[in-house]
Amino acid sequence: MVKVCFIGISLRLEHAAIERLRSELDVLAQQEPEIEFWFHGFHSDFIKSMLEEVVSLKKRKPNQHIEIVDAVDPIELDAFKKKAQEMELSEEEQYDRQLRADHYIAHSQRIDRWMVNGCDYLITYTYENLLDTENTTIKLARAKNPNLKVISISVPSTAERIEELKAQLDDRKKFVVDSLLDGASYSSLGRTLGITSNRVHQIVGKATRLIYRQLKEELK
């Protein structure tokens, strides 16, 4: 039994990304006879899309051992059930078992990291030419688990569009983003600019939000 997790930015997936995902899921189902797909929360368009495609895979492979596992914070026990109702899933299409992550109660990001660090396959939708916590989580997971198989469904044309949008940032934001991507630390960059590292974080956050906001408009 292999464990599959997902991590991605909160964008509506392009048609090309969905097609890549379906293809990768079919290949995975051919390679692995027993698969668990792990989820935690349904707070992003990305995770909602992943659930829809896993449910579709289960329908296409009715005789294969494919399970949906819901890792839950006891405070949000019904998150999966509510989403399943929204998607009008039948009872057999909902999660196969539920795992209470009690030791991480009320720490959503820690549950996500705990899941990712223990998975065999990680399906990702991120862009390395932009700073976000998802890329950091992937790097940490790879360092912790050298055998982790990472499957990217990102789209090259979107990566190119991100470069175009970065070029439209004002000089300060662009300098900060490019410097951090090149390996500069927040503290050293703060000293260079004469500002606090916290202010550097704020600048990066604003730049990232501007780019994601534009991408969301274009991908509607």
Positions of PLM-derived features:
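Acidic/glycine-enriched connector segments
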Residues: 2-156
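Short glycine/proline-centered loop/turn elements that form peptide/ligand docking sites
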Residues: 152, 185, 207
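Short amphipathic alpha-helical boundary/capping segments
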Residues: 158-169
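Short amphipathic alpha helix immediately N-terminal
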Residues: 168-184
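Helix-turn-helix DNA-binding elements, focusing on the entry/boundary residues of the two helices
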Residues: 186, 197
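Short alpha-helical "recognition helix" segments of helix-turn-helix
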Residues: 188-193
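Short, Lys/Arg-enriched C-terminal cap helix and immediately downstream tail that follows
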Residues: 208-220
